[in-house]
Amino acid sequence: MENKYGIVGVAHVGLPTNDLQKTVEFYKSLGFEVIMQSYNEKAGEKVAFLQIKNYCIETFENGQAAMSDGAYQHVALDVEDIESMYQKICNEKYTVITLSLIHI
């Protein structure tokens, strides 16, 4: 397939949140590093950029993040050992919404 626009990867994924601090702490606990935090005056939103290796997430507190069908509800992370990561998550304080791994 022709790459007529010169796209070479994903720069970042933007995720709305209702609690920026809680979201930042969650991603930090997974090993992400906060590379920038700011305030978007035009939108009236606190913003944070988090990075792990070459993967970047922008999260912004807009007070309108919905947990419903059609809402952006997950980010897929590539890991070195999915079984080990799943066990670590299950053993931590996180809510696990599936009882087994789903390989795609």
Go through the PLM ranges and name each one.
Residues 1-4:
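Basic/polar N-terminal segments that are highly enriched at the extreme N-terminus
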Residues 7-8, 14-56:
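Core segments of cupin and vicinal oxygen chelate
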Residues 8-19, 48-51, 65-90:
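Vicinal oxygen chelate
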Residues 58-61:
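Acidic-residue sensor for enzyme active/binding pockets
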Residues 102-104:
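Conserved small/polar residues in nucleotide/adenosyl-binding loops
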